[in-house]
């Protein structure tokens, strides 16, 4: 399984991420061709070799050729990506990043998610950075992403909302649940886009996972800090963990006094925050009270973040957790062509093909046909790998 490790020793930004992926093998021309699937223009892409403190890296720059670019709301960006010609997995990754970013902006500005109005992020260059990251991860075949802690930074930064403290409020919101590293000096080290990429896609934090490195990419930021090279280091490698074996935590609590309608929202919040699986099962508690057992399977690094969600989004006043190991069948995520269009599917090593729910749901809504019919069509036409 291909894994990527983001070593954010100097921070992370959207352009640094795309630059590192280019250095790892994403051709700039492929990036241009894939981005052509988005319904907007008025920009050019440039990538070049640079040096930061004597270390060679790659920079990535988006230059606007049309000055009059509209600001965009989150709802419009989400619809634009969904209606584009991008691959299903690229759409899914980009949507996860944008939604995480929109949630942070909504929390900071106190507005509903649908009304979030992006300024810097709504600009073409930031849309390119986020979608470009999704394109790069898909092109390189990355199936799991891990990251180091993030530097907090200090000082002030100029934004569309005026002069704000570092990290910007949206960045600070996105950093919740992510380990922070020691102070490395003045300046903005993590941008909202960079924080959103890590918050939305990282499967765990800390040192690199067991892996055999296949390549290293250095993505250079625009600024040149005096303390250390302004580079994002991304390691691409093959996982060396026992095939299909993974250390996890099981988080549990029993709930007997909550409106059942809230359970669905609780599950959504946990899955969006990185839970590997969430399940509800009925049980009888003392005095024969009917209740629900919430079980969350999680990466050990996500314990604090997921526990906080359980305690804030439910009536639970406590929970328990314990380590466990799980074994999963080796699988890859692929895009298959069907009579209904491109569909994302999981392909197991046995050859069995399983349709991806989000991809099938999108087709069902677009074509106005029952979801079960989409599943049957995909299973019939894709069959065995």
Curated annotation (Swiss-Prot):
GO terms for molecular function: lyase activity; nickel cation binding. Gene3D superfamilies: mk0293 like domain, Transcriptional regulatory protein pf0864 domain like. Coiled coil: none annotated. Keywords: Nickel. Belongs to the LarC family. This is Putative nickel insertion protein.
């Amino acid at each position: 399984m291909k894994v990527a490790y983001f070593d954010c020793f100097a921070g992370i930004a959207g352009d640094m991420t795309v630059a590192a992926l280019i250095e790892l093998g994403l051709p700039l021309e492929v990036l241009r061709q894939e981005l052509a699937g988005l319904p907007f223009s008025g920009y050019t892409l440039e990538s070049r070799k640079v040096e930061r403190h004597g270390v060679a890296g790659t920079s990535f720059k988006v230059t606007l050729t049309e000055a009059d670019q509209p600001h965009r709301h989150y709802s419009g960006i989400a619809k634009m990506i969904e209606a584009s010609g991008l691959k299903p997995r690229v759409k899914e990754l980009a949507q996860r990043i944008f939604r995480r970013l929109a949630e942070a902006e909504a929390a900071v500005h106190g507005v509903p998610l649908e009304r979030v109005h992006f300024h810097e992020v709504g600009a073409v260059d930031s849309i390119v950075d986020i979608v470009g990251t999704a394109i790069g991860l898909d092109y390189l075949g990355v199936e799991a992403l891990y990251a180091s802690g993030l530097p907090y930074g200090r000082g002030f930064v100029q934004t569309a909302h005026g002069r704000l403290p570092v990290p910007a409020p949206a960045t600070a919101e996105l950093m919740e649940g992510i380990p922070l590293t020691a102070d490395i000096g003045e300046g903005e080290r993590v941008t909202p886009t960079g924080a959103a990429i890590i918050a939305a896609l990282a499967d765990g934090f800390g040192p690199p996972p067991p892996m055999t490195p296949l390549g290293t990419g250095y993505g250079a930021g625009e600024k040149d800090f005096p303390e250390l090279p302004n580079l994002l280091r991304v390691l691409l490698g093959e996982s060396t963990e026992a095939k299909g074996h993974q250390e996890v935590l099981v988080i549990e609590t029993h709930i007997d006094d909550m409106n059942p309608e809230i359970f669905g929202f609780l599950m959504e919040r946990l899955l969006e925050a990185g839970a590997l699986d969430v399940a509800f099962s009925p049980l009888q508690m003392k005095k024969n009270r009917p209740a629900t057992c919430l079980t969350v399977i999680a990466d050990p690094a996500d314990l604090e973040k997921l526990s906080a969600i359980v305690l804030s989004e439910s009536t639970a006043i406590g929970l328990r957790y314990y380590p466990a190991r799980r074994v999963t069948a080796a699988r890859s995520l692929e895009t298959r062509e069907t009579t209904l269009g491109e569909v994302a599917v999981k392909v197991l090593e046995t050859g069995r093909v399983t349709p991806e729910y989000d991809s099938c749901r999108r087709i069902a809504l677009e074509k106005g046909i029952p979801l079960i019919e989409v599943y049957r069509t995909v299973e019939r036409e894709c069959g065995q790998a």
